[in-house]
Amino acid sequence: MTETTILHRPPTRLSRVDEGAVCRLLQDVVGACFAVPPEQMRAGSRGRAPAAFARQVAMYLTHVVFGLNYSAAGRMFRRDRTTVAHACRVVEDRRDNPRTDALLQALEDVLGAFTRTQVRR
């Protein structure tokens, strides 16, 4: 198998047991990148713009990197599937900014590598 094949392998579906761990991991990693405490990302309300965008990024990564559908991602973050769909659109629109795109690509690469190492175990 070539390196290209490995990098473009479709995401593996997580078991229900893993979803809670993934949610905490994403909140910690994304929260650190955006200087937002994980508690703010877990809040029931939208919160301030930085916390809301960090939560949107975490939901986007849940869908893109870990392959969860909108409903499953919504359950992880205690949000509706339409909220996750909106988050994905917002994040995709923000990728027009080169700095945001580079940060998101780095997060996707790191979390994708983590996923591949966990799947092999």
Residue ranges: model-predicted function:
Residues 71-77:
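Short alpha-helical "recognition helix" segments of helix-turn-helix
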Residues 27, 69-70:
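Helix-turn-helix DNA-binding elements, focusing on the entry/boundary residues of the two helices
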